[in-house]
Amino acid sequence: MNIVDQQTFRDAMSCMGAAVNIITTDGPAGRAGFTASAVCSVTDTPPTLLVCLNRGASVWPVFNENRTLCVNTLSAGQEPLSNLFGGKTPMEHRFAAARWQTGVTGCPQLEEALVSFDCRISQVVSVGTHDILFCAIEAIHRHTTPYGLVWFDRSYHALMRPAC
């Protein structure tokens, strides 16, 4: 059996481009958010996403108790916000750096996000160091910005929507 070491795996994963997202929650355990690229669709019936969250992350207990979240997919130009939510910055400073509205689940929705998916966590599966959060989508908010943001080869890249 061939065992892949951690660094080889991480280097290979850097070749997979992914949307940049800020995942937010608010509820009985408080308000929290983090940057994630490990987000993808599961099914459209019922509309469901998955989000991967390290159980060792400081935000894990908040998401685990609140059981709601909003996936805010970032637009080009929002790299500083991604970096802020991806670091050790206190939560109040993270949220003060942008404009938010409250989604139907009570979670913060980034006003200038490319798209926001307001969700309830319907199932959690633990694998290795992470929990896979299956998220039932309750509402979607799309913005008109033409530029998306992806993380590829350990750096940000802007994408432009084709003209309609």
Swiss-Prot record:
Gene name as annotated: rutF
Q: What terms describe the molecular function in GO for this protein?
A: FMN binding; FMN reductase (NADH) activity; FMN reductase [NAD(P)H] activity; riboflavin reductase (NADPH) activity
Q: What is this protein called?
A: FMN reductase (NADH) RutF
Its catalytic activity? FMNH2 + NAD(+) = FMN + NADH + 2 H(+)
Gene3D superfamilies on file: Electron Transport, Fmn-binding Protein, Chain A
Q: What is its EC number?
A: 1.5.1.42
Q: Which organism is it from?
A: Escherichia coli (strain 55989 / EAEC)
Q: What induces it?
A: Up-regulated by the nitrogen regulatory protein C (NtrC also called GlnG) and repressed by RutR.
Keywords per UniProt: Flavoprotein, FMN, NAD, Oxidoreductase
Judged by the first EC level, this protein's enzyme class is oxidoreductase
This protein's superkingdom?
Answer: Bacteria
Q: What's this protein's function?
A: Catalyzes the reduction of FMN to FMNH2 which is used to reduce pyrimidine by RutA via the Rut pathway.
Which GO terms fall under biological process for this protein? nitrogen utilization; uracil catabolic process
Instruction: Write down the PANTHER family for this protein, in alphabetical order.
Output: FLAVIN REDUCTASE, FMN REDUCTASE (NADH) RUTF
